From Swiss-Prot:
Segments forming domain PDZ: 175-274
Tagged with keyword Hydrolase: yes
Active-site residues per Swiss-Prot or TrEMBL entry: 19
PROSITE patterns in the cross-refs: ZINC_PROTEASE
A Gene Ontology term for the protein's cellular component: plasma membrane
Stated name of the protein: Putative zinc metalloprotease spyM18_2031
Enzyme category, top tier: hydrolase
Species this chain originates from: Streptococcus pyogenes serotype M18 (strain MGAS8232)
Membrane-related topology note: Multi-pass membrane protein
GO function terms (MF aspect): metal ion binding; metalloendopeptidase activity
Pfam families reported in the protein's UniProt record: PDZ_2, Peptidase_M50
E.C. code: 3.4.24.-
Amino acid sequence: MLGIITFIIIFGILVIVHEFGHFYFAKKSGILVREFAIGMGPKIFSHVDQGGTLYTLRMLPLGGYVRMAGWGDDKTEIKTGTPASLTLNEQGFVKRINLSQSKLDPTSLPMHVTGYDLEDQLSITGLVLEETKTYKVAHDATIVEEDGTEIRIAPLDVQYQNASIGGRLITNFAGPMNNFILGIVVFILLVFLQGGMPDFSSNHVRVQENGAAAKAGLRDNDQIVAINGYKVTSWNDLTEAVDLATRDLGPSQTIKVTYKSHQRLKTVAVKPQKHAKTYTIGVKASLKTGFKDKLLGGLELAWSGAFTILNALKGLITGFSLNKLGGPVAMYDMSNQAAQNGLESVLSLMAMLSINLGIFNLIPIPALDGGKILMNIIEAIRRKPIKQETEAYITLAGVAIMVVLMIAVTWNDIMRVFF
């Protein structure tokens, strides 16, 4: 149960942070955001703000999305002869078009619609008391659809495809950017929780409770200078010296550890503890605890994590295998393991997954943010927009590829994790 809760929290935070990036910069670019959804499936709660954005909390606590005006099937269609109730503002402009039998306004004007243009001319025409009349429609007017859903109309100037190239590009990039920011922040938080960043350039150590070194008398911040005669000046020297000293070690044999404590040099016999195929002496690298060290340490972890992911991506391209990919099932398995290991493991996993999500979404495949960014760049170079039909077909092809890949990866994960 703890693993499921951890998975939902991690996955939810990653997606919400990602989608908030798209949402925020879409609004800043003048694009009408129709909906910001947390979760998937049926609505549990909804609220419409003054800007016409619907905020929804949905039943399945997995994922979320941002729906922008002009994306996909976003056209409002009113069939000829459809009865509607028009509510006018003080200037005589239509501020509400009610196509349903609910949410009726007693002051509204009944009409049978014969024509409309809610994108360019912003007008609606129809029969009012058997007389044909045309009314101007307010730029921020709303439509109550037949099922009772109320949405804002989307004039051309607030649709995604009519925003500036720069506006669309930053809107598409903002999702991955937010994931990178989240990953860096969580890594910095992790370093602060750990008390600092491991100092691998030093031979000072932290001694693990009940470990081999602790039993031999070593204490935190002691300085190991030699192991079995091998000189130690750094953490890398220490690990290599332990490896060399224990290479042919018998079950009850010890190694000699020379260390400096309170300016006094001591040599003790330490019996290493075996873990799997390696020996340890129960020490960790000392920590750099300065505020600046912690900040830089978090950035270093994020940078290292990004390079690890990029190398994995490179390996995937040069030698593709489903076993190198992981979907929601693999993510659940990792979340479950992290939950068992404590908060620090959960934060480390969240940070890595956030950076991974950011990098993955920048791959220039249609349907991913990277594909949209690539089309924005092509449009900027050509200095003319890509046809909506062409863009739709390209995106559809990308979606098909991603769906097939996700099904294959999920099936492979299920077989690997549960069987």
